[in-house]
């Protein structure tokens, strides 16, 4: 075995993809010292997507002052690549849930304004190509905060300018984009997301995600009504119907809210990573792909990171072995095309112990070593 590609997603709540790959690499090096090992950063559009891209592309890190979800000053950073032409921005760095104490979370009052400030900063630096990862937000403002920071105005029925927060979507009567930053006309945005929810409705942004962001049941209804109303206003102003567009409900409606006003497209995070980092070229001469995530189940094959990896492996006729902290539906996963699906737990443990980072890394190392030892016997 001459070349193994390590393409692990994070084991959420336990260990990140980089550390998982390091543990796997150690085991392979001990058993197959002459094997070429390629570590490939993976994420599916949620937290870690832009970090994975910045790491792999050796991005220049720049910092700027913006506003957090409650419009308090905060310093954030993002990556610049391609000789200053492309900015890689993590939405959550300016308006993510971790920025707000759990008892203060309220998507009626939060805004994506800071993300727009990050984009404006990148435009000043000359960037015209953008990748924005939109997982983990504390907002439900459909992106009006970001657009306001870039020059848009949202007016009520009395021509008063609205604060760009979730509770005001229902009040939007007019949209004024005449003062949008002119550099946006020559810019392109790839919006990387990890969900396919529509803009509103029972499977939409408010009903599915607003409770995690602090909304009570009445606020969920208000936010959903706001999204419905705003989608209709957008349709009247732009003739674009975003209501049931897959992914439009990502990040509190930001997924769909940007499309009518920017040269933007929604893509799954894993597709963005695989395309940007040319994963297929990496895999083409490989003998094996090792991948994995915290839990392997039927959802694994539904547009998530491992599904993208598997499809490339199948195209290049390279076997794919997946490791998981917990494994369900093994036969279904095999039918999807995985060569093998293996749990890393050596014996029954509590969830707390299973999630302990050192325990997870030890289990990855031990399991990978056993996989490689079997392979050695059949490739002598």
Could you say what each language-model-derived stretch is?
Residues 2-134, 138-380:
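N-terminal loops that bind phosphate or other acidic moieties
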